[in-house]
From Swiss-Prot:
GO CC list: cytoplasm
Lineage: Bacteria, Bacillati, Bacillota, Clostridia, Eubacteriales
Record carries keyword rRNA-binding: no
HAMAP family: Uridine_kinase
EC number, UniProt record: 2.7.1.48
GO-annotated molecular function: ATP binding; cytidine kinase activity; uridine kinase activity
Binding-site list for ATP: G11, G12, T13, G14, S15, G16, K17, S18
Top EC class for this record: transferase
Protein name, per record: Uridine kinase
Pfam families per the UniProt record, alphabetical: PRK (PF00485)
Source species, domain of life: Bacteria
Stored InterPro entries: P-loop_NTPase, PRK/URK, Uridine_kinase, Uridine_kinase-like
GO BP, sorted A to Z: CTP salvage; UMP salvage
Length: 208
């Protein structure tokens, strides 16, 4: 098996990273592509009380177990299988279960801090930044956290203004300079996604 192509997709919360990742995923056969969500690599907090766990700043680099993510990407690059963690956002810690992920020709890594860490960044063959208007992102964040993570609208808005927005300015927005490609409006930008898919297919063809 050839070394996998590692594609990093980053951008602010609600920017459309997952949509871009899924659009690329759907353009290939299931047996040749896999998606690794950085959200799965939030640190295990089972040693903390629930009251302490809910205080976690999920928008800070220290919230992630980047060392484990880097280790897993290196293993996938060698053709090995990994056990990806599962994070429970209602309990604010990892589940005991894991998901087995096998090495594929294409590995997409998607998350807000993908380009923030130097070692992680250097593993990536293609680095994508999804750039979306702040108003659109907060609306998406509110809808997602209420529907998928059991949050109230007040708690989401308070978190966005007090934590998410300043963390975006400090840690995420500056990583745009490391991107090979910037995709405005995320999954709505079909032209940019089609260009990306064509480029990936070209690299795959050259590597065979």
């Amino acid at each position: 098996m050839m070394r996998p192509i590692l594609i990093g997709i980053t951008g602010g919360t609600g920017s459309g990273k997952s949509t871009v990742a899924n659009e690329i995923y759907e353009s290939f056969k299931d047996d040749c592509i896999a998606i690794i969500e950085q959200d799965s690599y939030y640190k295990d907090q089972s040693h903390l009380t629930f009251e302490d766990r809910i205080k976690t700043n999920y928008d800070h680099p220290n919230a992630f177990d980047t060392e484990l993510l880097v280790e897993h990407l290196k293993e996938l690059s060698k053709g090995n299988t990994i056990n990806k963690p599962i994070y429970d956002f209602k309990e604010h810690t990892r589940k005991k279960e894991v998901v087995e992920v096998k090495a594929k020709d294409i590995i997409i890594v998607e998350g807000i801090m993908i380009l923030q860490d130097v070692e992680l960044r250097n593993l990536l063959d293609i680095k994508i930044y999804v750039d979306t208007d702040d108003d659109v992102r907060i609306i998406r964040r509110i809808l997602r956290d209420i529907k998928e993570r059991g949050r109230t609208i007040d708690s989401v808005v308070d978190q966005y203004l007090g934590v998410v927005k300043p963390m975006h300015s400090q840690f995420i927005e500056p990583t745009k300079k490391y991107a090979d490609i910037i995709i405005p409006e995320g999954g709505q930008n079909k032209v940019a996604i089609d260009i990306m898919v064509s480029k990936i297919k070209q690299i795959l063809s050259e590597n065979k």
